[in-house]
């Protein structure tokens, strides 16, 4: 029977051995991709400047995930935090990649073995001798094992009892490191930014999974439920599995885009909402204000601001600024950040301090407008000089830098002031190297943006897959004319296929 390309998976419908084979091969491909991608990223990753050229600026995708689980060292002698390493041990970045590739090879061989030896006694009913799968029991086994893994991760790996812990940082992404995390069992455990919730939720969900698995192993489903939900049909398994996957994809798309303890900004870059809400700008102002109240000068106060914090307060690190179809890392857009020029402070000829209105996330161009402390427009860069009232020249705006490379330097010529006013629209002002990577000056998104876009799209796709396969299994009698009570497990690749005249259609 010839099959069109979109129906080829039906060849494993009544063949448990080869169903296992294709799933093992799929896992081999996933594991092989992960290991290979890690090696590729390690080959192109430059660990020399974790502050101004972190992994997320370089477009690393799998390295952040390896890092958040506790791996920080490389066999190349470097650490993600900038220190030199002499003995990285097995669980280095390269070690993790190698283990995935070795696992992929073993799974590849296992898949071939199961494809060749598909007709095992294990898959035959002891009473009838016919091929059959006890799907509710298999569900119980999977639930029990995944619960065990979930519990083990939360109770041992995350807590540091037997493992490194996970990446934990402060709210501003400045002091991150791998450390053990104690479970948070109170209401604080439900705070998405509290790492303690990761430990407690894995422990709780793991215990629930273990108990649910044991329940499904020891209790048989009622006959009416078994028939009503088509528990004897493997397409029911496909449908419910797709549901689990699309739900997980929606959840992680949300936690990645909006931010959480599981997606630290040091590894994945800031979120767009931190730019929209002036999150870093407010913290910087607060720190400067504290320093001034301690008697420091403006220059000294701004010099105390960590370059890392200032760099977060720059629109080019906002994942919403990169178009979805602009390929490449952030460094390929605005360039490799070299240094912070300092905080630009603007004043008019009357001595009022002026603030440049910052560009919102969804604008490519935005008028350059300078406001005073009360929000009144005092200066701008006009579109048409003939009608201008607030031009830099007319208002006599000057700019002075505090902190950074231009600390103490001031400019009064209008052309230079306009240049820095335009750049101040984008947050703190940095110097970029655009020559090394031939960067084109067009913003790119961070791995946070790619991950969200990919998972939201696949979640939607898989949602329709769940509806499709759920509908097929629940209404098999309507769509294919096959009695839903027909439980014959028959020869590989021959029966229960659409358009196959030899399929039995009714239960005896």
Curated annotation (Swiss-Prot):
Query: GO molecular function terms here?
Result: chlorophyll binding; electron transporter, transferring electrons within the cyclic electron transport pathway of photosynthesis activity
Please classify the protein's predominant subcellular localization into one broad category.
plastid
Keywords, A to Z, come to:
Chlorophyll, Chloroplast, Chromophore, Membrane, Photosynthesis, Photosystem II, Plastid, Thylakoid, Transmembrane, Transmembrane helix
User: Does the keyword Transmembrane helix feature in the UniProt annotation?
Assistant: yes
Q: Where are the transmembrane segments?
A: 21-36, 101-115, 140-156, 203-218, 237-252, 457-472
Cofactor mode of binding and number, as noted: Binds multiple chlorophylls. PSII binds additional chlorophylls, carotenoids and specific lipids.
GO BP, one annotated term: photosynthetic electron transport in photosystem II
Q: Give membrane topology per the record.
A: Multi-pass membrane protein
Question: Which InterPro entries does its entry note?
Answer: PS_antenna-like, PS_II_antenna-like_sf, PSII_PsbB
Q: What compartments host this protein?
A: Plastid, Chloroplast thylakoid membrane
Cellular component, GO annotation: chloroplast thylakoid membrane; photosystem II
* HAMAP family to which the protein is assigned, alphabetical: PSII_PsbB_CP47
Identify its protein family: Belongs to the PsbB/PsbC family. PsbB subfamily.
How it assembles, according to the record, is: PSII is composed of 1 copy each of membrane proteins PsbA, PsbB, PsbC, PsbD, PsbE, PsbF, PsbH, PsbI, PsbJ, PsbK, PsbL, PsbM, PsbT, PsbX, PsbY, PsbZ, Psb30/Ycf12, at least 3 peripheral proteins of the oxygen-evolving complex and a large number of cofactors. It forms dimeric complexes.
Function according to Swiss-Prot or TrEMBL? One of the components of the core complex of photosystem II (PSII). It binds chlorophyll and helps catalyze the primary light-induced photochemical processes of PSII. PSII is a light-driven water:plastoquinone oxidoreductase, using light energy to abstract electrons from H(2)O, generating O(2) and a proton gradient subsequently used for ATP formation.
Protein's UniProt name: Photosystem II CP47 reaction center protein
Q: Which organism is it from?
A: Chaetosphaeridium globosum (Charophycean green alga)
Q: What is the lineage of its organism?
A: Eukaryota, Viridiplantae, Streptophyta, Coleochaetophyceae, Coleochaetales
Q: Which gene encodes it?
A: psbB
